[in-house]
Regions:
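Acidic/histidine-rich, metal-coordinating catalytic segments
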Residues: 77, 88-107, 125-127, 178-183
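Mobile genetic element proteins and their domesticated derivatives, centered on retroelements
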Residues: 34, 51, 57, 77, ...
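Active-site beta-loop-alpha junctions of metal-dependent nucleic acid enzymes
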Residues: 44, 63-89
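An active-site-proximal beta-strand-loop segment
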Residues: 29-60, 66-68
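C-terminal domain-tail junction helix/linker
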Residues: 93, 108, 115-119, 140-214
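Basic, flexible linker segments flanking DNA-binding modules
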Residues: 1-30, 128, 187-192
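Hydrophobic (often cysteine-bearing) scaffold residues that line and stabilize catalytic clefts
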Residues: 28, 48, 69, 73, ...
Length: 214
């Protein structure tokens, strides 16, 4: 190792009790990814791979898959890369990827792909899914809605996932984000919105004072 004969791993293993040294401070510093499964009547189980931006909780990419292979993970990451434009030469840094230790995430094929893209891989401690808490909560919220219905074709399920992702990203206010939407935070609209809210609140309070004094 002293003579650089042993290379450092492209991934980092974090313990369940560990926290990141510094919370993310901007979009595309850390991406969380995970699979969940959904059933299509008479078709069987399908697997949803999602990628969530840790800072904003914005869903960057998702794919409904027939399995949980490294290739399907790569395809979803590729969609996130294209969406975010991180290959642009002007982008100076790459996000880290946080996942669990499923077979698709520890595969050689994914390791080589991430190395080529300059994306460092962080994996949670085995059997502690709370490490990927944000993506886990997102999938749980999504399934609480989607599982109210039955789906009879993969296309029907995909359409409902697309509708939910749009709702979650653009219309669902999140308490942990100062009651902003993930899109507000991801696209940097948060400060302006919060300032306007304060102004409206101040005007409302002043009107109430005037009314009470009259």
């Amino acid at each position: 190792k002293a003579h650089d004969l042993i290379t450092s791993p492209v991934y980092t293993l974090i313990m369940a009790r560990d926290k990141f040294p510094q919370p993310t401070r901007s979009p595309n510093e850390l991406w969380q990814t995970d699979f969940t499964w959904l059933k299509v009547v008479h078709w069987g189980w399908y697997y949803l791979c999602s990628i969530l931006d840790d800072y904003s909780r914005y869903i960057l990419a998702w794919q409904l898959c027939i399995g949980m292979s490294a290739e399907e993970v790569k395809q979803t990451i590729e969609a996130a890369i294209r969406f975010t434009g991180i290959r642009d030469p002007k982008v100076m840094s790459r996000p880290r990827l946080l996942s669990d230790n499923g077979p698709c995430y520890v595969s050689k094929a994914l390791k080589e792909y991430l190395e080529d893209e300059g994306i460092r891989h962080t994996r949670g401690k085995p059997y502690h899914p709370m490490t990927q808490g944000k993506i886990e909560r997102y999938h749980r919220s999504m399934k609480n809605i989607l599982l109210l219905e039955h789906y009879y074709s993969p296309d029907e399920l995909e359409n409902q996932i697309e509708l939910f992702v749009d709702y979650y990203n653009n219309h669902r206010y999140h308490e942990a984000l100062n009651n902003l939407t993930p899109a507000d935070v991801y696209y940097g609209r948060g400060p302006e919105i919060l300032t306007k809210r304060k102004q409206v609140k101040r005007r409302t309070m002043n009107l109430r004072k005037r009314y009470n004094l009259s």
